[in-house]
Amino acid sequence: MALTQERKREIIEQFKIHENDTGSPEVQVAILTEQINNLNEHLRIHKKDHHSRRGLLKMVGKRRNLLAYLRKKDVARYRELIEKLGLRR
């Protein structure tokens, strides 16, 4: 199921760095994590949906790259983000 505008707004409010922040790595990773979790639930039910599985792998790769960028730029922000999201890294 796609992310609703309301849910996306909630995520942005929770992870934004400053007012009007929609594109910081923290916000992008949080939105991707929510989408990945939703798609994981979908794939548990629909095991043969390989098209969506490929989309999931692309999202995971994009999130990995954003996390690597954030870790390189600011380790403190990176650690805070993975703790908030509950990612095991």
Curated annotation (Swiss-Prot):
GO terms for molecular function: rRNA binding; structural constituent of ribosome. InterPro entries: Ribosomal_uS15, Ribosomal_uS15_bac-type, uS15_NS1_RNA-bd_sf. The keyword Ribosomal protein applies. PROSITE patterns: RIBOSOMAL_S15. GO terms for biological process: translation. Disulfide bonds: none annotated. GO terms for cellular component: cytosolic small ribosomal subunit. The keyword Ribonucleoprotein applies. Keywords: Ribonucleoprotein, Ribosomal protein, RNA-binding, rRNA-binding. One of the primary rRNA binding proteins, it binds directly to 16S rRNA where it helps nucleate assembly of the platform of the 30S subunit by binding and bridging several RNA helices of the 16S rRNA. Belongs to the universal ribosomal protein uS15 family. PANTHER family: RIBOSOMAL PROTEIN S15, BACTERIAL AND ORGANELLAR, SMALL RIBOSOMAL SUBUNIT PROTEIN US15M. Part of the 30S ribosomal subunit. Forms a bridge to the 50S subunit in the 70S ribosome, contacting the 23S rRNA. This is Small ribosomal subunit protein uS15. It comes from Geobacillus kaustophilus (strain HTA426). The lineage of its organism: Bacteria, Bacillati, Bacillota, Bacilli, Bacillales.
